[in-house]
Amino acid sequence: MGREIDEELIITPPELTRTIETAPAYSEELLKTATDKNYKLKTLRRDKQQAEADSKKNDRYDGQLKASRVDMQLADVSTEEEKVNIANDLKKKLDAINTAAAEYQNKKDANSKAKIEWEQQQKSAKLGLVSAVELQALELQYEQTEMELSAAAYAYDLAWEEYNMLMNGTTLDIYDVYKSKLS
């Protein structure tokens, strides 16, 4: 698991020319897909089955039978709580995708506008209508919008990756704690 400490970390830049997709609409079918693959729910179901099996054994004392029934009730409550958590996480991930998609589109538009403006000012500079300092300022502004576009593309890709991980049943607990400490 993981990688060697001295292994080179390869980061591939996002594709900036792709079409921007919005997230699918929240539905019960989408929630069912997410809950079917969730490992916590599978664990809770297994715990309940174990408690049911323990409660059916004839060699148990009254206290042990009550404990098994309490374990079954606890598993039921925990299962419902986890389903609510998954539904809330799914809604958050879908909102994050749509927010990142809108931001990405805004940055694409701003970048194309800055590029056109910079190219026009380069032509004006050749004619002597714009000073070298003004041209450098516009170039810097254009490069700034390119950086913002790249950051928006990474955020968009990350939002989709988080959604895909949730839908595949991958837990994001450690990642969410790390992300919350960064912000």
Task: Please identify what each model-predicted range represents.
Residues 1-66, 174-183:
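Amphipathic alpha-helical coiled-coil scaffold segments and their short linker/junction regions
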Residues 79-87:
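Short, charge-rich amphipathic alpha-helices with coiled-coil/heptad character
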Residues 102-150, 154, 164-165, 171:
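Charged, solvent-exposed structural "stalk/scaffold" segments
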Residues 79, 150-183:
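Acidic, low-complexity, intrinsically disordered peripheral segments
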Residues 86, 93, 128-131:
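Alpha-helical heptad-repeat coiled-coil segments that mediate oligomerization/polymerization in large
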Residues 46-49, 53, 70-73, 77, ...:
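Generic structural signal for well-ordered, non-membrane alpha-helices
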Residues 44, 68, 75, 79, ...:
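Amphipathic alpha-helical coiled-coil segments
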